[in-house]
């Protein structure tokens, strides 16, 4: 007796959700770690959700790092939601960690972005924690070897990018290095995209300066190397998401490599995000493919971008509604030195997709 197609489809869907295909970003479930869990004893490591055994071991040997990694998980989720707030796929499924839907379980363009962002975020958060003195195992970054420029001097406390990259990669890449978890093609794709995220973070390191001098003359400036804000790194990765390359796992010499599907005469660039499977249009709700749909999503009637009602609503139309907004108004500056404002209320028209 042959199984019905619907039964087979349901079984395959359930299997995809429980085979550990997406172990690499299950650690983002640390965002749900309760504040009551102090994370000051090694036995706490086993209580953390979404970790593979190698990450549990890293937790035990670097216990002081775990509170920072919890902050990184929360930061990655927030940055993803902000970066894609104006898109059909709005990264809401990242909050289902560790039990993702197929938009992040499979080798999609969306999972490529999340792997890159999570790798960048954990390294960014650790590097900044070193600078702020929150981690006993690290301190400020090294003084650069190049000259600081005329009128400048190196000083301050640089973000410790090298330590952030080292510990971030150890933790976030650990699941992809576990044997018998997912296909080799998926592992290669996820490791590649994670490295793209770290590359974007390296590119965000810039010289920051503070002026010194009499009456603000800025006769000398103290400078240091600092990372851009995480949202700027996320914006860079979103640009790479929009131009991501579809790849296939193909033999080249004695081993298989990821090569562009349509341009397989050239290797994959180190700077580009790659994906193995095409995504749906995310117009209609369909959990089998990880789509939440865009019904009831807010859209912008006057925009020509991805948040426009035409694009966001997929041609289904939209419904208007009115909203009351309370804001500061009639502000006055008083000498010296404060501002007083009144509170004004106005009505605005908004639109949601049918």
Curated annotation (Swiss-Prot):
Signal peptide positions (record): 1-24
What CDD domains does its record include? Answer: Wnt_Wnt11
Recorded GO molecular functions are:
protein kinase activator activity; signaling receptor binding
Lipid linkage positions (O-palmitoleoyl serine): 215
What InterPro entries does its record include? Wnt (IPR005817), Wnt_C (IPR043158), Wnt_CS (IPR018161)
Disulphide bridges, residue numbers = 80-91, 130-138, 140-157, 209-223, 211-218, 283-314, 299-309, 313-353, 329-344, 331-341, 336-337
* A GO cellular component entry from the record: extracellular matrix
Q: Does the keyword Secreted feature in the UniProt annotation?
A: yes
Description of post-translational modifications:
Palmitoleoylation is required for efficient binding to frizzled receptors. Depalmitoleoylation leads to Wnt signaling pathway inhibition.
The GO annotation for biological process reads: adrenal gland development; animal organ morphogenesis; apoptotic process; artery morphogenesis; atrial septum development; bicellular tight junction assembly; bone mineralization; canonical Wnt signaling pathway
- Enumerate the UniProt keywords alphabetically: Developmental protein, Disulfide bond, Extracellular matrix, Glycoprotein, Lipoprotein, Secreted, Signal, Wnt signaling pathway
Main location (coarse class): secreted
Cellular location of this protein? Secreted, Extracellular space, Extracellular matrix
Task: Name the glycosylated positions.
Answer: 40, 90, 160, 300, 304
Q: What does this protein do?
A: Ligand for members of the frizzled family of seven transmembrane receptors. Probable developmental protein. May be a signaling molecule which affects the development of discrete regions of tissues. Is likely to signal over only few cell diameters.
Q: Hey, which family's this protein in? A: Belongs to the Wnt family.
Q: What is this protein called?
A: Protein Wnt-11
State the organism of origin.
Mus musculus (Mouse)
